[in-house]
């Protein structure tokens, strides 16, 4: 039996496995027999665009996790971290949750390990900051912010109280901006229910760029800036972190901010596995052809955040690592892997940017679907409708819909469950990023 192994269960790997399984079912009567296996450290596909909503207490973490077991019909899901690939022997070696090393053979290999948070050589960053690429990180940020607000309420040291009530978010792209406004809304609910002035909670949003969310253009970026300022978020552009300590940060302009909470949301880079493969890369991502095949390896395909997919609409460029591209590349992957097995024709990946949607908290958003610039309530409606359309499972869509309705009419819950510890949410623990060894 022909064996197809998909590495990674993010948007691209999930969609590839789903499309390929559907195609094989359609060809089953003609004798098609393909064994599809997806290997991932987790048993779900994570809908990452809603992680700011998880951190802000709008959506439950379960609602953004799409289970592989009952969603990918005809696909065997295997828990494990892929460590290496033998391209000559056609085997993948991985470590399972009990630290047992196992291997599986393949006739076609699909490399979609995704991405991890891009870190820089900032002293203390890996130890004291947290990212937003996993449920562990989102849950930790939510619980940590609430815990700090609760501790500030009874702290007798004014300086430490102010530090507990100061949240620093680094990265004014759409993810970082969404996180800042959702945490701001969570803090406002906490202030209302815990009887303190919401103005006592300070939010600082940092970015080296000259504009907030340059992806949405100057007009919508300016609209977003007005919303951020109206909600009391201190936006500082052209500056970032120089040092991170347990109770303060130092910025590149040498100013100091006392804080106990630092969120690092500055972009992504290809998964660590990419460096181990010995294949050509571009900007830290695997080089692939327009049909998503790895050059020189006709049985190997790659796409998503881990691949430098040529953008045929902008010759010389590669597609950005967005959920929109990842999902659509997964569909083309499924088609092309099937074609390589003799079922159908190959297709090059070509997709024009359909625009972005950015949720800016209660009653506001900005969006540019099909280059139509929207802000305010119309953008909010488009943003939420898009997410409900894009979530690939009816049960999850229904749950998120109910969460949105609840958020419209009721205050957010300000309960800290402690489900994700500080160690769980470290970049190494939650994303698998190798950390620098201590001197």
Can you say where each PLM-predicted feature lies in the sequence?
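Beta1-alpha1 glycine-rich phosphate/pyrophosphate-binding loop at the start
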Residues: 1-84, 174-216, 263
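Active-site substrate-recognition segment that forms the wall
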Residues: 38, 166-168, 173-186, 230, ...
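FAD-binding core/adjacent interface of flavoenzyme oxidoreductases
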Residues: 5, 76-168, 263
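FAD-site-proximal beta/loop scaffold in flavoenzymes
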Residues: 127-158, 247-250, 256-328
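C-terminal, flexible cofactor-proximal segment of oxidoreductases
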Residues: 325, 332-439
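Rossmann-like NAD(P)H-binding beta-loop-alpha module
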Residues: 143-199
């Amino acid at each position: 039996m022909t064996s197809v192994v998909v590495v990674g269960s993010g948007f691209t790997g999930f969609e590839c496995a789903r499309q390929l399984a559907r195609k094989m079912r359609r060809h089953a009567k003609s004798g098609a027999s393909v064994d599809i296996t997806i290997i991932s450290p987790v048993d779900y596909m994570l809908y990452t665009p809603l992680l700011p909503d998880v951190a802000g207490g709008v959506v439950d973490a379960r609602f953004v996790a799409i289970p592989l077991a009952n969603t990918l019909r005809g696909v065997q899901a295997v828990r494990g971290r892929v460590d290496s690939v033998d391209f000559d022997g056609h085997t993948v070696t991985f470590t399972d949750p009990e630290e047992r090393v196992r291997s599986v053979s393949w006739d076609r290999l699909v490399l979609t390990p995704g991405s991890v948070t891009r870190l820089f050589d900032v002293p203390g960053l890996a130890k004291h900051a947290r990212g937003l690429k996993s449920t562990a990180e989102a849950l930790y940020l939510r619980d940590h912010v609430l815990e700090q607000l609760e501790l500030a309420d009874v702290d007798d040291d004014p300086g430490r109280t102010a530090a507990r009530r100061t949240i620093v978010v680094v990265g004014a792209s759409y993810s970082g901006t969404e996180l800042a406004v959702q945490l701001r809304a969570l803090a406002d609910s906490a202030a209302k229910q815990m009887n303190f002035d919401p103005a006592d909670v300070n939010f600082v949003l940092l970015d080296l760029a000259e504009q907030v969310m340059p992806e949405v253009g100057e007009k919508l970026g300016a609209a977003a800036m007005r919303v951020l300022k109206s909600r009391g978020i201190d936006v500082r552009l052209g500056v970032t972190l120089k040092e991170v300590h347990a109770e303060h940060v130092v910025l590149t302009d040498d100013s100091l901010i006392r804080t106990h909470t630092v969120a690092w949301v500055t972009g992504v880079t290809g998964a660590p596995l990419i460096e181990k493969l010995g294949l050509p890369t571009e900007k830290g991502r695997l080089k692939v052809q327009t049909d998503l095949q790895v050059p020189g390896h006709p049985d190997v395909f790659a796409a998503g955040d881990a691949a430098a997919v040529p953008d045929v609409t902008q010759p010389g460029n590669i597609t950005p690592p967005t959920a929109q591209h990842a999902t659509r590349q997964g569909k083309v992957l499924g088609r092309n892997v099937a074609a390589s097995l003799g079922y159908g024709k190959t297709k090059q990946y070509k997709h024009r940017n359909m625009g972005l949607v950015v949720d800016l908290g209660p009653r506001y958003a900005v969006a540019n679907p099909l280059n139509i610039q929207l802000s305010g309530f119309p953008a909010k409606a488009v943003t939420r409708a898009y997410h409900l359309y894009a979530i690939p499972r009816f049960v999850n869509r229904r749950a998120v819909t109910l969460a949105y309705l609840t958020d419209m009419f009721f205050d957010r819950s300000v309960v800290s469950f402690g489900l994700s510890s500080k160690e769980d949410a470290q970049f190494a623990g939650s994303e698998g990023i190798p950390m620098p060894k201590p001197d």
